[in-house]
């Protein structure tokens, strides 16, 4: 696979309505009383793809994800609904010097959404939580360097949203209306002439089925 020079990226973990039939060859796990599964790179590559402008490649236990030149962003979406508490755990490496990670929790009617945004800059990193475009919380104490794997945990427990990087809570907030029947995914967005790319591994997803 041809890999371009990567200068910037946006990663979006998204919640959308709808569900598709998907069978994974995965290991059953339990975390904080919630059943879950370890998702291999091969099974992750079977998730719903949003566009033909998306390039993926299984590299051992890792999945390489890249958008094509001229793309306006691509998404890899878990094709089943998630209701109630969940834990989305994985290791992520950006292949860029700057970028953003966004986690979106949207209800199944689409009338509101929460966005947890991590902005990766050369000088500092900023975490923000948005609700329907309004900033509700901001924090500045975390590290997210390119070409380094970080363990990320995105968790919803009751009305609480939490985001951890390498075991440290980066930002958290309380939802007024927790989203139901959401589907998690990963979206990357670069510049038109400089496509975004990431590598992801050790994915685990926990929720009450």
Residue ranges and their predicted role:
Residues 6-20:
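Hydrophobic membrane-insertion alpha-helices, especially the h-region
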Residues 22-53:
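Extracellular carbohydrate-recognition regions
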Residues 22-28, 67-127:
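Secretory/extracellular carbohydrate-interaction modules
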Residues 42-63, 67, 72, 112-113:
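Extracellular glycan-recognition surfaces and repeat-rich motifs
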Residues 74-80, 103, 138-144, 174, ...:
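Beta-strand-rich interaction surfaces with strong enrichment in secreted/lumenal proteins
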Residues 90, 148-165:
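Short tryptophan-centered beta-strand motifs in secreted/extracellular beta-sheet-rich domains
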Residues 131-151:
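Short, aromatic/His-centered strand-loop micro-motif at the edge of beta-sheets
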Residues 173-202:
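Flexible glycan-contacting loops in extracellular carbohydrate-active proteins
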